[in-house]
Amino acid sequence: MNEMKRLLSFVRRAVDDYNMIEEGDRIAVGISGGKDSLTLLAALAEMRRFYPKKYEIVAITIDMGFDGVDWSEVAEFCRRLKVEYRVVKTDIAKIIFDVRKEPNPCSLCAKMRRGSLHAEAQAASCNKVALGHHYDDAVETFMMNLFFEGRLGCFSPKSYLSNRKLTLIRPLLYATEKDVQYFVRRRPMPVMVSPCPEDHATERENMTNLLAELEKNNKGVKHRIFNAMCRGEIDGFKLTGKYPDAGKIEE
């Protein structure tokens, strides 16, 4: 199975299981320049060719205002995919690091970026926003909520923002980190290095490392956590009987 067919097997299943895409949708795809969002864009662009429900996609980047960031290669990538591309210039980095000097900036940054993305999606006449969170992200988010907030919770596979009249979808839900890496190794894309000084210095990075250690000593633990989320119907997750094989890659 080639890399695109493999990826689409996960994406199509998630989209169908949660009815993420409907006839006539105009979907904004949030593009950070990282491998996850670019992989999602490539998958949704390819799936337009054969998915029975016709839809349009618009790629949207929220430029945080860091110096020296060039989106021209991403723009060319979108042109090749025949996808409209919008870059929204903001001062988020300046506000967080220079004005407010936030000691723990990640939460505020995410909130501001989400607000800008949702506003631009509305401006582009989109009714849905697709985000690049995948299988491992779901497990990590669930565990972070358990460890640091003492609650059972995660982002939802599909959710509706009534104040924005936007539906958020996560089509990479069944694709693992290894699946995304497998795709990127075989399908060159303009993956960018994050200019954020807090990159890799977060609680999420710590949780990623903890889960990797648990997986090493307890094979399949992430798969079982994901399964438990579905059995418990945590935040809209549901049991369908078909999940990824814990990131198993056939080289």
What are these regions (language model features)?
Residues P105-A110, L131-H133, Y174-K178, N217-G220, ...:
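A general structural signal for short secondary-structure boundary/capping elements
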